[in-house]
């Protein structure tokens, strides 16, 4: 029995020793932290260094620091592993309360501290959370305040409401409630419809710097509400747009399919297989083509569409932009009878009936023009006759360039006559015509179709052009019967283009004169100083060539002028001073005509001519020698015309600017150069008499002569038309008055006759004698001239020519003082 008792005491003693040993190794790892709900309970939590049975091994003692206060013991509870928690019961907590805390492990004190509840407040969690879903699509959440109304925290709590979706934990939201009422209203539309949601709430007291309370128990509800009209409208608009787009696409596809299967099968002229002939270049003159700058601007496609859609609005602007008469106004050198220049269409389209056996498109190009004459000139003299392509590029300039080129061409043609006359300078052919006995001889004026007995075409028609030179003179020609001189060209319709260069520079020799009288066909007046017309037995005729346009004539003359090499013996300028012209004109004129000494001047002052005429008053006409004067006073020419029925108009002192071509081959015979023929034949003009220069010993000062001649020319002639100023007195009552020029009022002869072509002379008088040959010697004698000079020359008028008696101008008061001045009354 004793042995059994001793065996039981040994294990008990081991357990006691083990407990004592283990109690000595317990330590607090995290000191206790205490919070109060500021009502009746405070909660403390801590952690031990190892797993501990908190309820059996640890004790927490707390006591209010106040007189006669009693100490209280709290048995802790395990809070997950080594953690322990203990709830302290307190009565009516105030802000001044302060407690002491002691943690014991058996007989061992593990931790000692103090705790003030007013400084560590954690409100209680709200309760009774409820969700109301039947309030007009609005969610109402309500909960209860965890404190009674008499508590200090009752009116100082704020709340936070957490709502989340059960299906999607990420879909959660928190609403802060800062007002005192424990409720929250939210729109049901803010949440998804048809989904279950949960909500919970917690409280926080800001005045005591508290922490958030624990979450209240959650509540669940199913969110289902009626969607608003705005959302239905947005959805309806979206669906409607999609439907409209689908309908439009369906209609387009349907119409396209119907058009392809039904509408396109209807015959349409636009899709008919027709032949289109495209003319690349117009079959016209290069002068009629528009330049690149004058090409009308291409109308854009959108403007064409607008024109088709709105023709009434755009028709006025289109008509205003198109000005077809503008080009005709700007076209220079156009006669009165010629129609206005119209632009030529570069591209044309001709539609033919449908044909299967022909090609659909044929392009035609303009063939190069074959000009044998221009090729010969180019081979011999280096002409600049360009190819059609280069010519097309050259004439594609602006309208101003064309005007300038035409003006330059006219000046070149007019200036070229002073060096070449009617013959090419580089061609050694003579201007002299065959004698009268030759059957193949023809006169220079026969080259012009309008001259001669044939009926001349009207002024508005175009004349043909010849490039063949005149036939050279026969070896059997007699120099006594032929006399050749330069024939200047004058445009009577435009005084601005009178050949002023003919008065400055003369051709040096007759062999330099070219057989090119072609440009004179389209000019108005031709003045031969001494016509090279031989005595012909019978006139010959020239066949009528093919007509050409005036543009082609002008261009060909320009090409011929540029091709001429112009090898002159004495280089002269087109424009020279009048003094040099006086000095050089005598040598050149005497070399060409051979009527005077080589040192005499071709242009003399009028005073010197009048003075020198008194030396040899008995000599007159073409038979005068080289020492006789070419310019005679009119009283010297008057007495030699016995039986003249009526006076004729006084010659115009315009330095050869008012002469006209011969009337006809029958009336253009030259008088004999023998001394027996001192008068004028019936077919001659007074102005056509040769003008031999003054003798060398009677030449005056060139400067004085030039000044005197210029003053006389300026005083006697009109600045607009170039004719002599004539006035008629009251004593001319019985005569037919001379018609005044409509441009300047000067008396320029009988202008009442209808206009004719420049190359067609007016019909001669009934007796075959022109009006110029009917000068009356008695009516033309100015005062102050001796009767001896009047009887020195005579005229032989034709009988029956009384038609010119009505055109007698009156010239009086010739005064010669220094440089001769003349006054016309």
Curated annotation (Swiss-Prot):
Its main location: membrane. Residues 558-657 are annotated as: Required for IL4-induced gene expression. A motif (WSXWS motif) lies at residues 212-216. Residues 678-690 have a biased composition (Basic and acidic residues). Changing residue 99 to A: 10-fold reduction in IL4 binding. A motif (Box 1 motif) lies at residues 262-270. Changing residue 786 to P: In 1.8% of the population. Residues 125-224 form the Fibronectin type-III domain. A motif (ITIM motif) lies at residues 711-716. Changing residue 150 to A: Little effect on IL4 binding. It is a single-pass type I membrane protein. Changing residue 153 to A: Little effect on IL4 binding. On IL4 binding, phosphorylated on C-terminal tyrosine residues. Phosphorylation on any one of tyrosine residues, Tyr-575, Tyr-603 or Tyr-631, is required for STAT6-induced gene induction. Belongs to the type I cytokine receptor family. Type 4 subfamily. The functional IL4 receptor is formed by initial binding of IL4 to IL4R. Subsequent recruitment to the complex of the common gamma chain, in immune cells, creates a type I receptor and, in non-immune cells, of IL13RA1 forms a type II receptor. IL4R can also interact with the IL13/IL13RA1 complex to form a similar type II receptor. Interacts with PIK3C3. Interacts with the SH2-containing phosphatases, PTPN6/SHIP1, PTPN11/SHIP2 and INPP5D/SHIP. Interacts with JAK1 through a Box 1-containing region; inhibited by SOCS5. Interacts with SOCS5; inhibits IL4 signaling. Interacts with JAK3. This is Interleukin-4 receptor subunit alpha. It comes from Homo sapiens.
């Amino acid at each position: 029995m004793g042995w059994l008792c001793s065996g039981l005491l040994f294990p008990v003693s081991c357990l006691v020793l083990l407990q004592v040993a283990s109690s000595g190794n317990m330590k607090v790892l995290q000191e206790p932290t205490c919070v109060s709900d500021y009502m009746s309970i405070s909660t403390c939590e801590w952690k031990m260094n190892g797993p501990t049975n908190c309820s059996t091994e640890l004790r927490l003692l707390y006591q209010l620091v106040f007189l006669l206060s009693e100490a209280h013991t709290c048995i802790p509870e395990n809070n997950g592993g080594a953690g322990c928690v203990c709830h302290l019961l307190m009565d009516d907590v105030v802000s001044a309360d302060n407690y002491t805390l002691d943690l014991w492990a058996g007989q061992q004190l593990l931790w000692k501290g103090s705790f003030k509840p007013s400084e560590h407040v954690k409100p209680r969690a709200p309760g009774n959370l409820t969700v109301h879903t039947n309030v007009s699509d609005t969610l109402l959440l309500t909960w209860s305040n965890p404190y009674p109304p008499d508590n200090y925290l009752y009116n100082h709590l704020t709340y936070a409401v957490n709502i989340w979706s059960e299906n999607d934990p990420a879909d959660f939201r928190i609403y802060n409630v800062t007002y005192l009422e424990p409720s929250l209203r939210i729109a049901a539309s803010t949440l998804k419809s048809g989904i279950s949601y949960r909500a919970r709430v917690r409280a926080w007291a800001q005045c005591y710097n508290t922490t958030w309370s624990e979450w209240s128990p959650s509540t669940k509800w199913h969110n289902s509400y009626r969607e608003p009209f705005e959302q239905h409208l947005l959805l309806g608009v979206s669906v409607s747009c999609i439907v409209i787009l689908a309908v439009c696409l369906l209609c387009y596809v349907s119409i396209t399919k119907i058009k392809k299967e039904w509408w396109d099968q209807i015959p349409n002229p636009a899709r008919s297989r027709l032949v289109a002939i495209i003319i690349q270049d117009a079959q016209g003159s290069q002068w009629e083509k528009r330049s690149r700058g004058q090409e009308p601007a291409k109308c854009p496609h959108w403007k064409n569409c607008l024109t088709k859609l709105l023709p009434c609005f755009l028709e006025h602007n289109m008509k205003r932009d198109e000005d077809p008469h503008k080009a005709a106004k700007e076209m220079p050198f156009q006669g009165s009878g010629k129609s206005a220049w119209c632009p030529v269409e570069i591209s044309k389209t001709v539609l033919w009936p449908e044909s299967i056996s022909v090609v659909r498109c044929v392009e035609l190009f303009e063939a190069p023009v074959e000009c044998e004459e221009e090729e010969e000139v180019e081979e011999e003299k280096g002409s600049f006759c360009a190819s059609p392509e280069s010519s097309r590029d050259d004439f594609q300039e602006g309208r101003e360039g064309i005007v300038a080129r035409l003006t330059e061409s006219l000046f070149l043609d007019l200036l070229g006559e002073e060096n070449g006359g009617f013959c090419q300078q580089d061609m050694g052919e003579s201007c002299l015509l065959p004698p009268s006995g030759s059957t193949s001889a023809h006169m220079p004026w026969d080259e012009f179709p309008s001259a001669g007995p044939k009926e001349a075409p009207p002024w508005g028609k175009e004349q043909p052009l010849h490039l063949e030179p005149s036939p050279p003179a026969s070896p059997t020609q007699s120099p006594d019967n032929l006399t050749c001189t330069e024939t200047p060209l004058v445009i009577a319709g435009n005084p601005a283009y009178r050949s002023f260069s003919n008065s400055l520079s003369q051709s040096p020799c007759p062999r330099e004169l070219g057989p090119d009288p072609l440009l004179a066909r389209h000019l108005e007046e031709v003045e031969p100083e001494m016509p090279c017309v031989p005595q012909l037995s019978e006139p010959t005729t020239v066949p009528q060539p093919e007509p050409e346009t005036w543009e082609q004539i002008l261009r060909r003359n320009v090409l011929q002028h540029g091709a001429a090499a112009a090898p002159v013996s004495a280089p002269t300028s087109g424009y020279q001073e009048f003094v040099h012209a006086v000095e050089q004109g005598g040598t050149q004129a005497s070399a060409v005509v051979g009527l005077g000494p080589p040192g005499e001047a071709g242009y003399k002052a009028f005073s010197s001519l009048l003075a020198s005429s008194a030396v040899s008053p008995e000599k007159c006409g073409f038979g005068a020698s080289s020492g006789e004067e070419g310019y005679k006073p009119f009283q010297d020419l008057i007495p030699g015309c016995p039986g003249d029925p009526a006076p004729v108009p006084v010659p115009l002192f315009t330095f050869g600017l008012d002469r006209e071509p011969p009337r006809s081959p029958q009336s253009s015979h030259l008088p004999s150069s023998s001394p027996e023929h001192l008068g004028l034949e019936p077919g001659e003009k007074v102005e056509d008499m040769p003008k031999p220069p003054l003798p060398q010993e009677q030449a005056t000062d060139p400067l004085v002569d030039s000044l005197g001649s210029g003053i006389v020319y300026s005083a006697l002639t009109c600045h607009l038309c170039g004719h002599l100023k004539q006035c008629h007195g009251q004593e001319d009552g019985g005569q037919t008055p001379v018609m005044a020029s409509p441009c300047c009022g000067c008396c320029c002869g009988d202008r009442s006759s209808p206009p004719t072509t420049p190359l067609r002379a007016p019909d001669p008088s009934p007796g075959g004698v022109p009006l110029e040959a009917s000068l009356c010697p008695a009516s033309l004698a100015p005062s102050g001239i001796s009767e001896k000079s009047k009887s020195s020359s005579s005229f032989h008028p034709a009988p029956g020519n009384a038609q010119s008696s009505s055109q007698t101008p009156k010239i009086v008061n010739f005064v010669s003082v220094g440089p001769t001045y003349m006054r016309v009354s």
